[in-house]
Amino acid sequence: RVCADCPAVQFSDASGAASCKACGEGQYQEQAGQSSCLAHTTCAAGRRVIQEPNATQDRACEDCTAGNFSANANAAACEVCAPSTWNSAPAQASCSACVAGRVNGTQPTSSADHCVACDEGRSQSRDGQTACSPCPAGFVSAAGAPTCRACAIDTYHDEAGQSSCKPCADCGGGAKRKGCGGASEG
């Protein structure tokens, strides 16, 4: 009796077996004469598939680059981080949001440094937003503030988008103009 090696894609798990067995689903064998098949590699989240597996070859994976991600295993492609989100390392499964008071409205980015502070008189109170909003009349904010704050007692501002409040007019003797405060000069 002449023994022959099992071809690639098949194996024999017993010495002197009369026949070879096919590799099962999710397995491969690229070499002849083997006693088992190998399991296909799983591309983890943060990586993408660059070569699909078959009975004679394994799945090949590649890391997503910084500023990109894949949330699922065996992803066909990496996705670009959405505007006002970022990640700074390769092989990431998600992106982080720009924090409140900072935005990056149009471009995905690979660094939190690209999340820029809201200008004076504007704010953004939620993470991951793409634009800052002007403070309403009677409210002000410093650059990068996540929220606008109300003008203090005896101060006002009647215009939106301001960084400081105006003092109420002094009527003499320490008295202030009646009705002055918030958004009204009185």
Q: Where do the PLM segments sit?
A:
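Disulfide-rich, cysteine-dense extracellular ectodomains and adjacent flexible linkers of secreted
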Residues: 1-186
